[in-house]
């Protein structure tokens, strides 16, 4: 049986599973599919997870049954409720609660981060649900934004207990599973762990995601992500309060024993700022022992009895926890009653156990059945009717299974495969009237959002295509159901003939600087409606002022921080308001002014898949070895790999112009490295990522291939290092030259001589000495340069003497110094006797006798840059300065010293980095 191609108002979906009409597909997986169903009796929407047991092995089948066992034990307002379990020979049907507003992942991707007040309310709900699970010795092990759903009142519902397990206090678990960005470090290391501590870490990541709109630990590959998690360092944005930062840091502790417990989290200062009101229990929670008849909701039992459902069988089903049709109808009716009562203020609610049975309520229920009025138990303050847009609803392929499951496909479509009891009546569709409430509080808790891929557990690899969703929307425009795609607020836009209502938001918070995105629940379905000209014409025609055009068409509230930007840039930043640019925290030591802190927006990331045996990457690390991991290499080779295409000037230019770049240009920032280092790495990260994409084994620690340019840089760097270790002859030559040039003796200066000499007490020390080895920038070249002998600004140089020779004019330099290859070590100079006259020196210029009363040397405050050739000019980063007058008035008897292969001296240090425009070095004065 397949779905008919006729209009939906002629045939309401012929596909049925038990009492449920299948209305659409929420998600698909390899062995399961999640369908949107509606109960024929209660008219309640449910999510039906249909599992093909024939495609599962024993291990996965056991995991499915354990998930069912766990969900049967859980009954919490912030956990997805299990209504019914139906099983045939080859199929398993899990009927669960349906969260209309989808994943909080999608909400954050569309609306950006939450303010701390809203994040605190959400986190209290998550904390209460996890505490409830831990109290029943159940650990979730896969808490993430994709598994946190939002109901019609924007309350949290935890879903997907497929990775859940039971634990005992003091006993460790040994199975490693979870989602990598949310997994604790002990899971990556393959250690045994305690279940509650694992959930505490995941909740810390979730809280960070709620407040920041980005992941604290992220990486392009699993090994990089693993390394960042094991380091445990993450970035704290400027807008995060100190109390929130303290709480997150105490939860994301590498040592599991030092993490906060749930009781400590509840008592934390940040959590106590706003404590939620404890709502009374609408119906009693099932205890471990069998409940008595009086503990069930008598009002629901009477309503079921009026529908012709045997009350005794219902009670037996509830006591036996059979989760059959009787229990499902009971649970669904209880949920409708809860939805009805939740519309009233908390102070006016009473516990069901404290109330006497109301005859007026019973008469109201009876009138609802006799007169035929709908029993409207939905919240009257609902500001939005959920859209009935069902993606893939009219396609036959929406019910497709794997090729081997074709027989099972027809099995779950036949109603006869599931036994259903006979029911005399049913409730009518709970469609409340459209309410235009001007006094509603503009809070996300009153808002709803229609999502294309809403659902319980989206197991498909890809999301729904917006183009397909638009086709589905166009195909359902003629249906009889009302589609409300936006908030029902002050101004309505009615599409004639279609029965659909669009709304224009007239909230002043769109223009308020203090707005924290309270109005940020605009439907994602309208993203593809922007291309519909008829919709735009209708909306523009119904608007009294053009001021409302921009917020509605752009579908994003105005970011107050981006008021000064142009409309194009404002649209980019409003999509995810975590693109903060100013205001630094003292605890965030790695932030640099002018660099945007986050670029890994949730809207740019794919959903995180849960992974079994997450510690396999640890085994690969042990097999391959740490040398294959580029992140484990020392800092110098890492920068050699990543920094060869980014000069230092370009970094400064990028920092100056970063505020004018669009959001997509900035690199993703590592929480563990300085921004300059990260920027240098990002320049070569793109080609390495392309190579990783071509080779799938790059995912596991394999080093990306180096280019020839990178290998040449490393080779040249190694040659330079060897050359610097063997330049004693060059230092000796400079030492001899400085001794001969002591033409401006200063009696007040007594500077040390080179270590090789032991001068007599009467000998005057030369005013120049080299106290540190030559700069690594020195490298022989094939050209000559002019060298000025005035070096009075370098008064701390210490040079070594050359071997004595009898020639007054020597050859310029030994030939081995003119070669690129490292020279052999020179012979040591002969020792000098104390008191002996200094040997004749080798100079390439004539010596001269100086007058006895020489004027003192002029003071040179700043070093001057000597004229060099083009190749060496790039090596010099000292500032240019004009030659001082004292140099211009020097005696003309000095010939300029022409040294081959000799660049200028610099009192500088070399940063251990590679720069192609500076011949492989980045110099700092």
UniProtKB/Swiss-Prot annotation:
Subunit structure of this chain's protein: Interacts with and phosphorylates TORC2/CRTC2.
Compositionally biased region (Pro residues): 821-833
Disulphide-bridged cysteine pairs: none
Listed CDD domains: STKc_SIK (cd14071), UBA_SIK2 (cd14409)
N6-acetyllysine PTM sites in chain numbering: 53
Name recorded for this polypeptide: Serine/threonine-protein kinase SIK2
Activity regulation details: Activated by phosphorylation on Thr-175.
Natural source organism: Pongo abelii (Sumatran orangutan)
Family: Belongs to the protein kinase superfamily. CAMK Ser/Thr protein kinase family. SNF1 subfamily.
The gene coding this protein: SIK2
């Amino acid at each position: 049986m397949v779905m008919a191609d006729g209009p939906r108002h002629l045939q309401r979906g012929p596909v049925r599973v038990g009492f449920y009409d299948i209305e659409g597909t929420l998600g698909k997986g390899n062995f399961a599919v999640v369908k949107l169903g509606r109960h024929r009796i209660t008219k309640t929407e449910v999510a039906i997870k249909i599992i093909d047991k024939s495609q599962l092995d024993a291990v996965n089948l056991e995991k499915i049954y354990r998930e069912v066992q766990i969900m049967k034990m859980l009954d919490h307002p912030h956990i997805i409720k299990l209504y019914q379990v139906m099983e045939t020979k080859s199929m398993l049907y899990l009927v669960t609660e349906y969260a209309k507003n989808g994943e909080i992942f999608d909400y954050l991707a569309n609306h950006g981060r939450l303010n701390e007040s809203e994040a605190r309310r959400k986190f209290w709900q998550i904390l209460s649900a996890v505490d409830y699970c831990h109290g029943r010795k159940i650990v979730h092990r896969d808490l993430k934004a994709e598994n946190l759903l939002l109901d019609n009142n924007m309350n949290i519902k935890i879903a997907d207990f497929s990775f859940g397990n039971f634990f005992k206090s003091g006993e460790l678990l040994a199975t490693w599973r979870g989602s990598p960005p949310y997994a604790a470090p002990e899971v990556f290391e393959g250690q045994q762990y305690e279940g509650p501590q694992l959930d505490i870490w995941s909740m810390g990541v979730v809280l960070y995601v709620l407040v920041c709109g980005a992941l604290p630990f992220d990486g392009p590959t699993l090994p990089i992500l693993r390394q960042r998690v094991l380091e445990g360092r993450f970035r704290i944005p400027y807008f995060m309060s100190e109390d929130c930062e303290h709480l997150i840091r105490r939860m994301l502790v590498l040592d599991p024993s030092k993490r906060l417990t749930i009781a400590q989290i509840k008592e934390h200062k940040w959590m106590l700022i706003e404590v939620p009101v404890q709502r009374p229990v609408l119906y009693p929670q099932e205890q471990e022992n069998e409940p008595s008849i009086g503990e069930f909701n008598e009002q629901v039992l009477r309503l079921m009895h009026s529908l012709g459902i045997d009350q005794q069988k219902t009670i037996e089903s509830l006591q036996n926890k059979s989760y059959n049709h009787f229990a499902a109808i009971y649970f669904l009716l209880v949920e409708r009653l809860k939805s009805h009562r939740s519309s009233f203020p908390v102070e006016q609610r009473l516990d069901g156990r404290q109330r006497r049975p109301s005859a007026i309520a019973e008469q109201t229920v009876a009138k609802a059945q006799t007169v035929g009025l709908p029993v409207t138990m939905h919240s009257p303050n609902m500001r939005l009717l959920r859209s009935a847009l069902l993606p893939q609803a009219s396609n036959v392929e929406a019910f497709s299974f794997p090729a081997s499951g074709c027989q099972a496909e027809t099995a779950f479509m036949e109603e006869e495969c599931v036994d259903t009891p006979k029911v005399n009546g049913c409730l009518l569709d709970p469609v409340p009237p459209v309410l235009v409430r001007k006094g509603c509080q503009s809070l996300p808790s009153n808002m709803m959002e229609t999502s294309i891929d809403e659902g319980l557990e989206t197991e498909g690899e890809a999301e729904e295509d917006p183009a397909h969703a638009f086709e589905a929307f166009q195909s359902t425009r003629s249906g009889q159901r009302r589609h409300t795609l936006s908030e029902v607020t002050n101004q309505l836009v009615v599409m004639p003939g279609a029965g659909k209502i669009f709304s224009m938001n007239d909230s002043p918070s769109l223009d308020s600087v203090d707005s924290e995105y309270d109005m940020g629940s605009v439907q994602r379905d309208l993203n593809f409606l922007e291309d519909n000209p008829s919709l735009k014409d209708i909306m523009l025609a119904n608007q009294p002022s053009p001021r409302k055009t921009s917020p509605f068409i752009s579908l994003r509230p105005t970011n107050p921080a981006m008021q000064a930007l142009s409309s194009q840039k404002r649209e980019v930043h409003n999509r995810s308001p975590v693109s903060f640019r100013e205001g630094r925290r003292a605890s965030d030591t790695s932030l640099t002014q002018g660099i945007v802190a986050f670029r890994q927006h949730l809207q740019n990331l794919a959903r995180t898949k849960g992974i079994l045996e997450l510690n396999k990457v640890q085994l690969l690390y042990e097999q391959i070895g740490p040398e294959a991991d580029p992140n484990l290499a020392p800092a110098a080779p890492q920068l050699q790999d990543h920094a060869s295409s980014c000069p230092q000037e370009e970094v400064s230019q990028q920092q100056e112009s970063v505020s004018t770049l669009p959001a997509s240009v900035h690199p993703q920032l590592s929480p563990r490295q300085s921004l300059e280092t990260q920027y240098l790495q990002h320049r070569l990260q793109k080609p390495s990522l392309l190579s990783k994409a071509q080779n799938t084994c790059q995912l596991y620690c394999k080093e990306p291939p180096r280019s020839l340019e990178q290998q040449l840089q490393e080779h040249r760097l190694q040659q330079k290092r060897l050359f610097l270790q063997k330049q004693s002859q060059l230092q000796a030559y400079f030492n001899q030259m400085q001794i001969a040039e002591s033409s401006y003796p200063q009696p007040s200066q007594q500077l040390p001589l080179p270590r090789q000499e032991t001068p007599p007490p009467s000998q005057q020390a030369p005013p120049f000495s080299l106290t540190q080895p030559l700069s690594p920038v020195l490298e022989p070249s094939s050209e000559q340069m002019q060298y000025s002998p005035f070096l009075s600004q370098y008064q701390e140089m210490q040079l070594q003497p050359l071997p004595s020779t009898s020639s007054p004019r020597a050859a310029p330099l030994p030939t081995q110094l003119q070669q690129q290859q490292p020279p052999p070590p020179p012979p040591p100079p002969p020792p000098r006797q104390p008191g002996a006259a200094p040997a004749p020196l080798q100079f390439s210029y004539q010596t001269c006798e100086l007058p006895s009363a020489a004027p003192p040397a002029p003071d040179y405050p700043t070093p001057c840059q000597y004229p060099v050739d083009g190749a060496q000019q790039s090596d010099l980063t000292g500032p240019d300065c004009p030659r001082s007058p004292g140099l211009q008035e020097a005696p003309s008897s000095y010939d300029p010293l022409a040294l081959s292969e000799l660049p200028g001296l610099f009192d500088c240090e070399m940063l251990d980095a590679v720069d192609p425009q500076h011949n492989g070095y980045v110099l700092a004065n």
